[in-house]
Amino acid sequence: MKVSKEKWEKNFSEWLDWVLREAEIYDYGRYPVKGMGVWMPYGFKIRQNVLQLIRKLLDETGHEEVLFPLLIPEDLLKKESEHIRGFEEEVYWVTKGGSQDLDVKLALRPTSETSITFMESFWVKSYKQLPKKYYQIVSVFRYETKATRPMMRLREITTFKEAHTLHETYEDAARQVDEAINIYKAFFDELGIPYMISKRPEWDKFAGAEYTIAFDTILPDSRVLQIGTVHHLGQHFTKAFDFKIQRKDGSLDYPHQTSYGISDRVIAVLIAINGDDHGPVLNPVIAPIKVVIVPIPAKDEETTAKIINYAKEVGENLKNRGITVVIDDDKEKTPGEKFYIWELKGVPLRIEIGPKELNNNTVYIKRRDTFEGKSVPKDKAVEEVNTLLEKIKNDLHEKALKFLKERIIYTEDLNEAKKILEERAGVVEVPWCGDNNCGLQLQDVTNARVLGIPLDEDKDVSNAKCVMCKKPAKSLLRLAKTY
């Protein structure tokens, strides 16, 4: 069955606002502080399921969860000069306690490298204690001066998972970067989110990092959104805090660090990438409700009561197998109204039970993603539901991956690159000489952002010329219109 996607594709921004509000996921724009939204119960459950997955992946790889204070003293935040230069225009400052002026300004945490390094200097004294891998899931605050957008560009990022690790050598930290990349690949793959992995250019790396690796995806309007970053911090922060440890050879030296984070954007992408004009199609992995059962009333009350009891029996069978299910037996709503509501909420499967199913001892199961339906014997319902949920998960990932790949275009012609970015957006890959000046000029002439060097493909550009200066190319460079 062909499913309409016109609103989703052509008016994505309005579609997302509509879905978040009407599906009761996230109330944005009405709370009286710009750039701050409210997680509603249904959305909060989606958020919990996403965080449960990332916690599992981090815990399994030796990370330990911590919780640091929200407030960071000004002198602590400014310890690493390059770092504060990258954030100083975005920091919220607390300057009063009640009516009293504070002796030291306190920042609302924009990120936690400085506060975590400060505390690590008390905790870690020897290479024997390494590696250390910490993470926390907290709110961070950044005074965004660009137009704010729900979940994607916020002043309070409420779902900020930041990991911070400590290592004896640069090479150990580099290996941790690789582990972090693999953790995020497993995370996004399980969620069905397609991604590109790029090494950010020097001018766009994290403030205070040796280098930054980023995960990006393409949204329905063909603009690109950053969904995760991994930073090799080297010794920048440990030197700033004069934090040394004893090494294996007995000498004292500054340890090396990494940090990596994801945010609310992951949930925005989960809602966005598999939508249609009926609403989102949630991946069963994170759907708070995997199955909704809608009893279809009969003409007489006695048969209707039997249908509802039948539906409850089917529901219990599903619950006993660990499948989250809701039975919508609200007498005030018609079946059509119920279908509309649960489609808008993106519930992966709907089971309809009416007089026909009651008489035939069957259930009618309908997929949210394709709207394809089939009758199944009641005693096979659990088995069929499990099969369909797995198929929906895989099909959604496959469709999203196809969508992304179709929007990555290679060209060796600068004018063509400009035209593609202007007319179609998506991602353009061009040959690049490696010179930062050429990269910055590319941003200017294309009115796009350089995402960096692809790390997830190895296209040979040895015979190509840089699109800007015509010198021999050293690598590909990705360009895109971004959020």
UniProtKB/Swiss-Prot annotation:
SUPFAM superfamilies: C-terminal domain of ProRS, Class II aaRS ABD-related, Class II aaRS and biotin synthetases
Broad enzyme group: ligase
GO biological process, one term: prolyl-tRNA aminoacylation
Subunit (UniProt): Homodimer.
Coiled-coil stretches: none
Cellular compartment(s): Cytoplasm
Family annotation (PANTHER family): BIFUNCTIONAL GLUTAMATE_PROLINE--TRNA LIGASE, PROLYL-TRNA SYNTHETASE
Domain comment as written in the entry: Consists of three domains: the N-terminal catalytic domain, the anticodon-binding domain and the C-terminal extension.
Organism: Sulfurisphaera tokodaii (strain DSM 16993 / JCM 10545 / NBRC 100140 / 7) (Sulfolobus tokodaii)
EC number(s) on file: 6.1.1.15
UniProt protein name: Proline--tRNA ligase
Tagged with keyword Protein biosynthesis: yes
